[in-house]
Structures are given as C-alpha cells and as structure tokens.
C-alpha cells in the first residue's frame, strides 16, 4: 500500500488491473483499499474499443498489467485520464510499451516492490459505504457499465457464500474462475477469506483438467457458472470420478439432463443461487433444499427485500 501511495495513489483514485489470476492481483487489491482508493479489475480478454471504453471511463491513476497482455493497449486512447504510472507484472517492461503509457512512469513489478515506501500515516480504514471496486458489466445492452461497489456490498458477497456453503477453516476452495469477476473474487476468494479457509487458484477453467486440479488441491468446494458444469459432466466418465474431497459445487443454472447424475457421479451436493454484480446474491439454496431446475433457493431476508 505504501508503495502505491509513493506513486501518488490516494482516496478516491482508481487502480486499474488487467491481470490474470495471480497473487499480485490480490495483494494490490488490498493495498488499494488501505489507501481509500478504488480497485478496477477488468476482463483480461478485452481489446480495442472494448478496452478503451473501460480505460477512459475508469480514468485510473495507476495501471497494473501482465506483461504478456500489454499489447492489448496498443491503439487505445486514455481520453482525459492521467495515468501517472504503469506496473508490468510477470515479465518486466516490454520492448514496445504501448503509446498510451508514454507519459507514465514505467515499472516492472520488481521495480515497484523496491520503491521507497510512503509514510504510514496515509493508511486508512475504509467505511462500509466507501467505494471498493468499479466492476464492469458484460455489456449485454450496450457498452459495459461500471458498477460502483461499496465495501459493505462486496463483503456481503463473501459473507453470503460463507454462510450458504457453511465454509469453515478446514475447507479448501478451488477457484478456476477469473478474479476480475465478482463470482471468483468476492464469492469464492472473499468467502474463503472470511471463513479462514484455504484457496487454490488456477489461471483459467479447463474441463479436461478440472478433476485433476480438484484432487491435487484436495478441494472441498468449488463454483461452476453457466455452461461450466455441463462441460465437466460431458467429459468422459470414469468409475473413479467420485474419488475426490468435494462436498459442494455451487452451480447455476442446472439442467434435468445432467444435474442429478452430476451429484451421483462426483459424490457432491449442488447448490444454486441467483444474483448480479449490481444486486449481490440475494438467494441461495441450502443444505436441506432439493435440487430443482429453475430454483435459485431462498432469499437471505436478513439482508435483502425481494
């Protein structure tokens, strides 16, 4: 946090991250919060006009980018934004730095880590209503909208998951979804953080590698969104598929064609839920609820009115 402060980051400033599933993403996220600044994790597949829209909209003071993703910024304009520094992660400063960063201070992550720290007096404890993130929607009806997400809203993503899945210190959460998304970052990582559980994070989802990863990590919990659980189920079956430590898979939506057989095959309980970046996860199925297609569970009426 004090090294981000040395780059000029302070309350209300934005730190934009085009970063794969790496520990550096999580460390700089918490560092941003300790300065009262706002973290902006964006989709690592963005390029061209889609990337430019979010860069111009967020107006970050500092940009973090994986070195092998930096080419995505070629041809992109920051508009009225004033990027004072760019930090290249896992690979150092590229030979051809995109022109959008030409006036910014350019550092490798090692350079950044070696910066002289600012005075500790700049550290703050954010209030629940302070903005923690700008997370961008998928842009179904037009350009992606940046959702202003207060700390309390983000914490509730994790708390709801922790309670619904009964996460405890002994659990191990296998995270194969992107950490720029509320599901991977807030439901899975933050839910585990609240519970004091372990996390095992991989770069991306692979149905071919899924079960091997689950076994290697000794995972007890994981999430599978959209078509992911069906892709897993369509993988060739083996009599050893149930040889794993999973107890719960948070999956939505599910289908009659495979949901019950998925539970039997992998010896797990499927839980469902409903939510969006903007509104949190107001409903989950519980451990005693039947597995029903089209049912997102019961409303968390302690926190939501639906």
Where are these regions (language model features)?
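Conserved AMP-binding A3 loop
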Residues: 132-156
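Short hydrophobic alpha-helices that are characteristic scaffold elements of the AMP-binding
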Residues: 30-35, 57, 181, 190-194
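Conserved pre-ATP/AMP-binding loop-to-beta segment of ANL
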Residues: 101-110, 114-136, 143, 166-172
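ATP-dependent adenylate-forming carboxylate-activation enzymes
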Residues: 19-20, 37-56, 67-72, 197-216
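Conserved AMP-binding/adenylation subdomain of ANL enzymes
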Residues: 155-172, 180-220, 229-231, 235
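Conserved AMP-binding
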Residues: 19-22, 43, 167, 177-181
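Conserved AMP-binding/adenylate-forming
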Residues: 2-49
């Amino acid at each position: 946090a004090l090294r981000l402060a040395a780059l000029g980051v302070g309350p209300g400033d934005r730190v934009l991250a085009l970063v794969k599933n790496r520990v550096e993403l999580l460390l700089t996220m918490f560092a941003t919060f300790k300065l009262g600044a706002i973290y902006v994790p964006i989709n690592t597949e963005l390029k061209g006009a889609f990337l430019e829209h979010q860069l111009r909209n967020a107006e970050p003071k500092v940009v973090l980018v994986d070195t092998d993703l930096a080419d995505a910024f070629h041809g992109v304009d920051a508009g009225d934004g004033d990027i004072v520094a760019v930090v290249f992660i896992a690979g150092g400063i590229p030979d051809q730095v995109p022109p959008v960063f030409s006036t910014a201070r350019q550092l490798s992550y090692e350079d950044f880590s070696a910066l002289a720290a600012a005075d500790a007096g700049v550290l703050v404890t954010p209030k629940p209503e302070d903005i923690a993130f700008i997370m961008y929607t998928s842009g179904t009806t037009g350009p992606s909208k940046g959702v202003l997400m207060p700390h309390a809203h983000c914490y509730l993503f994790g708390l709801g998951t922790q309670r619904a899945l009964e996460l405890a210190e002994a659990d191990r959460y296998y995270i194969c979804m992107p950490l720029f998304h509320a599901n991977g970052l807030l439901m899975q990582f933050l839910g585990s953080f609240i519970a004091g559980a372990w996390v095992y994070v991989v770069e991306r989802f692979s149905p071919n590698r899924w079960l091997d990863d689950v076994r290697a990590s000794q995972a007890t919990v994981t999430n599978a969104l959209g078509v992911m659980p069906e892709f897993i189920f369509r993988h060739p079956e083996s009599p050893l598929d149930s040889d794993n430590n999973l107890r719960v898979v948070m999956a939505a939506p599910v289908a009659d064609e495979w949901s019950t057989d998925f539970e039997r095959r992998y010896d797990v309980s499927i839980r469902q839920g409903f939510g969006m970046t903007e509104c949190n996860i107001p409903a989950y199925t519980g451990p005693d609820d039947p597995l029903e297609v089209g049912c997102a569970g019961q409303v968390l009426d302690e926190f939501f009115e639906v």
